[in-house]
Structures are given as structure tokens and as C-alpha cells.
Amino acid sequence: MTRAIVIGGGIAGLSSAALLARDGYDVTLLEKNASVGGRAGSWEKDGFRFDTGPSWYLMPEVFDHFFRLMGTTAAEHYQLLRLDPGYRVFFEEDVRAGTPPLDIRDSREANLDLFEQREPGSREKMSAYLDSAKDTYEMAKLRFLYTSFAKFGPLLRADVLKRLPKLLSLLRVSLADFAARYVSSPTLQQVLGYPAVFLGSSPYITPSMYHLMSYLDLEDGVLYPVGGFHKVIRGIEKVAEAAGVTIIRNARVTSIDTDGPGSGAHVTGVTYTGPRGGKPKTLLADVVVSSADLHHSETALLPPAQQTYSQKWWDTRVAGPSAVLVYLGVRGRMTQLDHHNLFFTSDWNDNFGRIFNEPRSIPDPASIYVCRPNTTDPFVAPGSDTNLFVLIPVPADPSIGAGGLDGQGSPQVEAAANAAIAQIARWAKVPDLAERIVVRRTIGPADFAGDLNTWLGTALGPSHILKQSAFFRAGNKSKKVKGLYYSGGSSIPGIGLPMCLISSEILIKRLRGDGSTEPLPEPLFPTVDRTV
């Protein structure tokens, strides 16, 4: 059989390995850590169970499609609940005025009503905004997300050409400016601009093409996998193993091996060691797929002559934010919070400027995200206690430091965590929050860099600014080494769990020479064994 090695056991690596095995390859996956999942991990302490990363389940059809490609369904592996409210928003100016937070509902009509209440006369314009968001989203799925851009002919379709003037306009205007055309309320503009953070970016530098994200949270709805996101990871791991994938954990890849030193060589396999070094081991392969951070894959695992994306190239790129993550076990209930909660400061220019512009620093006060999953799932915290996951966007800079248990992380990380805890206590009216904390763990940019090998300690990957979107984003095939491919958030189509699943499908299409733009037919039928 044709042998394939996948580097990295995050969602992109697991799904890539699964689809490769389904396609007929003999697949081995190497994961540097003791467990798979990457950013989408799980941590437990004293009866509290935390998702360590992703917590928003959007684009459910992408997950369903992946599982159907594998001959099963998402529903066979985990249960989904629809959230209503989808999320709650605390605005700084509302806190000052004593106004209740805004609950974003699970339907278009309910959210149009909310916008109309906040800004009388906005309903008609917001209806047009959501119509445009949905149309752009459907066009993206059909023509731009499931393609490797290896061939541009399939993109020259009548439906694309018809929308070309609109698409070009959406690329030239920022998301912030585009949203301001539809609503004048600064708080509503924040609701429309915040999805840029999911893209590792700022609404001031993100193309308005991405207003399509508002279709997902304001109309399509927000879901939750019961038990947490590790259930999703476990489901993908199970279908991968059922397809024949061999998973080797605690395997730190030290090099991608080739049959020659220069450009044009072919992969022969990889070399790896255990977590504490030891004697290197070599695995042979006809195809190598790295789902690890692309900067690490290129600059650490390949010599300069074989790097498609050299350090010089990376020096011209923009990293998405890093984050300080805070996992809190809190005694008692916190009904002031919903499942998903956003805390928006009034001065977003300052917030995003501190993250992306020099001199960079941790915003204070910061716009933060807080997840309280036991609003929906009683099994993530003991009894009537509360599980909180807090995300504070910070610059992609490992020098900010690492996290730790019980306040023992780096000073900047713990200071950001303390500020966020105080902010939640004040804005959500939980004055004794700090005294009720019984479990505390933090993660900082240095942890992302060290544990996940991420470029500059980014929590997400390269930002989705224009020059790093669609066909401008790093591709999924090496230009210097034959048989070397990529998947994951660093390459096309981009950041987020759904995009990582799509990247694994684009990989299969690239290997097959399939330049189409549509998702593959379900289920996936094998085309290998063959010469690559």
C-alpha cells in the first residue's frame, strides 16, 4: 500500500489521517503530546472538566459532511444542543448605565427584533445585511472553501462572475467600515465586527467578505456538543482508527526526510524521538502531511533549500492574536452568565491596536470571552458549582510568558487573568467571584509556542487579512519537496475547526488532482493504491 505519515494529532491531523486511510493509504499519525486534540484538548481537576480551546460549534454541516465521507454521521458520535440565547453580550457603556446585557437569540427574526429595539429603523438594513451574509457564505462554500486553488478554471463559473463586482468590493472594504453602513450604534457594530476575532484578526483590517460570519451566529445558530469539544475530537479519532490509522503518541518529529538535500527532492519519511529525546526513529513514507504549525513544519523540520515558506517570507506575514486562557472552578452558581458571554470595552481601537500595532501590549481593560458551559451541560462541574473558561486576546508574543496552576504562571499572564476576573465580577455583578475560586489554571503565549509549536505563540494561526485569505493564503502542497503536503489552520482555507476539517478534504482533492470547488461526494470511495 502507499504509505502516508501525518504529523500532528489536532483536528486537522486526525481528519487528514482518517480521509487518507479511507482513500486507501496506509497511514501513521505522529502526535508529540500524550493525547490527541491539539488546541481542542480537555483538562480535569477536582470534578471540573474544561475544554482547553475551541468552544463555539458553528457550521454544523461541515462536521456532518466529514463524518458522512467516513461512512458514518456526527450524530452517531455526539449529541448537539442548540443554544438560546446563542450568546450574551456585556457592553462597557451598558454596564455604566445599568442597562442589562444583550442576549443574541437563536433565530434571524428574533435578532432583527433585538437590533430594531437597540436602533429603531435598523431592521430593514439588517435584513439586507444578513441576506448578503448568507449569499456570501453559500458562495464561499460552493466555490472558495473546498478548493486548493491549484486550478483557477473551476472558479470561472457564471455564479462567481455574476457576483464578481460585489466580491471585489467586499475585499476592498474593512469589516468595521462595512458594518457601519448598516448600523450606527457602536454596540451593534461591535456585534457585527467581533467575528473577526474568530479569524485571528481585527474588524479594522479584516475584509468585509467575512461579514458572512454573521449569518452563522445571527441566523444559523450556535450549537454545543454535549460533554464538550473533546467528544468531537474523540469521534474523529474513533473513525480514524476504525479506518486503519495507527496513532503514535509522545512522538516528537525532528525532521521531514527526503532523498536529496535540495529543491526537487522527494519525501522518504520522517524522523522522530520520544518526549524526552532518546534514540531517533525513522518511519518511511511515500507521502508526508504536516498538520503541525506551518512555520514550524517549514523552518524547523526542513533545511532552508527545501522551504517553500522561509523565515524571510514569515517576516512579511501577520500573526493572529495569542491569548491568555483562564480555567476557573467556582463554588456556587453564576446565573448572571449564559453559556457564551462577550465583554466588550468601548474603545475597540485601543484594544485591537495594542494587539496588532507596535508597541504591542496586553489591553487593559480588555474585551474578553467567557464560557460557562454548565449553563447547558451539568456534567462539567460538580454539584451546583460553576465552570468558567476565560479568553483574553493578547499580542502573539511568547515573552508575555506561560501560565500555571493557582496563580503560579508568569507575572504578565497572571496579571491579565486577575484583571479579567475582576472585570467579570464587576460587569456581571458577582462581587465575591475571586473568593469563590477553588480551581485555577492559566495558559499563556509561551505555552502555545512550547506545547503546540505555534508561530510567535499565536493561539490561532496567520491572521485572515486580505493578503492571507483564500488564494493568498499558504497553499497545501510544498513547492520544493515532492510528496509533502499540509493541512490545518496555517494553510488554506484557514482558521477554525470547520476550516481544519475542510483542509483535510482539500488535501485529498489535491492528491487526486481534483481541481473542483465543491465538496466531495459522500461517502468517500478509495482511489489508492497508486503511485503518487
State what each model feature region is.
Residues P54, G489-L511:
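A conserved FAD-binding loop/helix module that cradles the flavin
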Residues D94-I205:
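Rossmann-like flavin
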Residues R252-P382, F525-V528:
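Mid-domain catalytic core of redox enzymes
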Residues R331-A446:
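C-terminal segments that line or cap access tunnels to active or ligand-binding sites in enzymes
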